[in-house]
Amino acid sequence: MAYELPQLPYAYDALEPHIDAKTXEIHHSKHHNTYVTNLNAAVEGTEFADKDINDLIAMLDALPADKQTAVRNNGGGHANHTLFWEVIAPGGSNTPVGEVAKAIDAKFGSFDAFKEEFAKAATTRFGSGWAWLIVDGDSVAVTSTPNQDSPVMEGKTPVLGLDVWEHAYY
């Protein structure tokens, strides 16, 4: 089984005016696709080629040393972007509901306080990377990771990811 570029559940222009159609197309069909292509090349013919992407990046230390960097960068890029495309839905809600809302309120006191913390994680990430809302034990937390690292690599569950690479917003 080769890893595949997921189809977007919306058109490239569906995120306008926040992300223009050309940026969404390049980001998905070029950048994300490159991560998938390079990941497949790295794991082709190995026992790792059939792993779920999140299972694969969670076991980086168990991979052969010569595969770890390629899987970290490209597997992380594929996993991160797959979540990214799922959570930035056009016409989505501006505020969380249900269990996510309760967890945010319990941890941060309010959605506005969460937004401040999340924005801080995104704007203070030196260089390229991601800002995250993660499940950490019985609570949620805000964190950031460099490059294409994923919270999954640290045993955490990402709920929301914001790509802060320069290529995300030409």
Curated annotation (Swiss-Prot):
Catalysis: reaction(s): 2 superoxide + 2 H(+) = H2O2 + O2
Domain of life: Bacteria
UniProt GO MF annotations: metal ion binding; superoxide dismutase activity
EC number: 1.15.1.1
Alphabetically ordered keywords of this record: Iron, Metal-binding, Oxidoreductase
UniProt signal peptide: none
Note accompanying the cofactor annotation: Binds 1 Fe cation per subunit.
Pfam families xrefs: Sod_Fe_C, Sod_Fe_N
Disulfide bonds: none
Cofactor(s) required for function per UniProt: Fe cation
Positions bound to Fe cation: 27, 81, 163, 167
Family matches, as InterPro entries: Mn/Fe_SOD, Mn/Fe_SOD_BS, Mn/Fe_SOD_C, Mn/Fe_SOD_N, Mn/Fe_SOD_N_sf, SOD_C_sf
GO CC, one annotated term: cytoplasm
Protein task: Destroys superoxide anion radicals which are normally produced within the cells and which are toxic to biological systems.
Quaternary organization: Homodimer.
Family from the record: Belongs to the iron/manganese superoxide dismutase family.
Protein name: Superoxide dismutase [Fe]
Source species: Raoultella planticola
Taxon lineage: Bacteria, Pseudomonadati, Pseudomonadota, Gammaproteobacteria, Enterobacterales
